[in-house]
């Protein structure tokens, strides 16, 4: 019971301190605001703001990166069928080795 009280107290203190930072007192001088630029943009090139649908789980505005990554880094062309054949051969060799061990141990 006491631990719940301490958790609630810590939450209240953290919530109060973050809300104070979010809404500063307008009467206090704003020293840092003069040093920072007037307009800052954190958006990366190629990002666009998209309205999320109600069925996709986002329900609000979210950022989507434009599909330009394939132009920057090309995907290597790999023939997967060759890899599958090699894997099947390796599996057969492993089975044969296990059978050879079983024959030697049974003899």
Swiss-Prot record:
Residues 1-22 form the signal peptide. A motif (RxLR-dEER) lies at residues 40-58. Keywords: Host nucleus, Secreted, Signal, Virulence. Disulfide bonds: none annotated. The keyword Secreted applies. It is found in: Secreted; Host nucleus, Host nucleolus. One of its GO terms (cellular component) is extracellular region. The RxLR-dEER motif acts to carry the protein into the host cell cytoplasm through binding to cell surface phosphatidylinositol-3-phosphate. Belongs to the RxLR effector family. Effector that suppresses flg22-induced post-translational MAP kinase activation both tomato and Arabidopsis. The perception of highly conserved pathogen- or microbe-associated molecular patterns (PAMPs/MAMPs), such as flg22, triggers converging signaling pathways recruiting MAP kinase cascades and inducing transcriptional re-programming, yielding a generic antimicrobial response. This is RxLR effector protein SFI1. The lineage of its organism: Eukaryota, Sar, Stramenopiles, Oomycota, Peronosporales.
């Amino acid at each position: 019971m006491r631990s719940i009280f301490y958790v609630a107290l810590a939450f209240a203190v953290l919530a109060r301190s973050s809300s104070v930072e979010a809404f500063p007192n307008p009467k206090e001088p704003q020293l840092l605001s003069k040093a920072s630029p007037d307009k800052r943009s954190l958006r990366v090139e190629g990002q666009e703001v998209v309205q999320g649908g109600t069925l996709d789980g986002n329900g609000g505005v979210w950022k989507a990166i434009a599909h330009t990554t394939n132009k920057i880094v090309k995907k290597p062309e790999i023939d997967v069928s060759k890899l599958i054949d090699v894997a099947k051969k390796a599996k057969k060799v492993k089975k044969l080795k296990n059978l050879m061990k079983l024959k030697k141990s049974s003899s």
